[in-house]
Amino acid sequence: MPESTKSESTMSETYRHFTRLFPYPHERIAVGAPATDAMARYDELAQLVHTERFVPFFLNLTDTVRESMVIPVSLEHDIIDDGETLTPEQVSAYTRAILQRYRTARDAASAEEYGSAAIAQQLRRVMDDGEEANEDDPDDFNLNKLMGEFMSSDFLPDEEPEDDAPCLCALLRYELVDEEDKGEMLLLQIPTDDPADIPAYLPFGGWNDCPDAETQLAFTHYWREKYGAIPAALDGADCLEFLVERPVTDPVEAKNLAVEQFAFCSDLPFQVFEDFEQLTEFIHQSRQWYFWWD
């Protein structure tokens, strides 16, 4: 079951540093706690979003996570990326700056209009990177050809709907571990009434092929508007999960969504799933999405 407090002796240095910089109200989930219990508590808190002005979010906190969140804030303020140097006020200033840049760039466009353009731009970047890799290694697969064949194929996902209530993979894994060094699961209360803003409050990404916070905001606002999809859990520094209120039900639209998710996480159809077809099967009518970056 969730624990709201622990004794000082059980507080890790990672936890102390994180909560000093990100002083969001939270509950601590005991290692081995049933995932269904944690999900039930999440659902309870989610009912309070509009009255209490916060959104729940699971974070499996590790030192790598803490460091990955310190770096973008440090870069924003042009200071050494030292968790001891930063202040909570600088973290708040970072959040405000990221949100303001997103809103300024979006201007009068709707979340869906701006998101569509941003996703197209991100997809071009990913495809260009794949094309360059193919030029360096002609024996490697041709990404542009692969994408074209997928979109023009007759493949459509199965029509069978998903009946089971969603349960986040991060919680299922945490239920099975029995070592404290696997991280500590926190159920945070992020101080916003818009879950699409979470990337600005918990900065991660901007490394390898993981988009930075500003790019993530374009995706999260677009997907929230279109599917009611919201970020729900960050498992370590490289696994992000969404819960989806209005799953995609049209098979052709599911293929298009698979391409959008590829733009967001280019490792998805090749390292998490076997191919675009398997990714499409997973997201079609699914109430949860999963992303992992190498």
Stretches with model-predicted labels:
Residues 177-224:
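Surface-exposed, low-hydrophobicity interaction/linker segments
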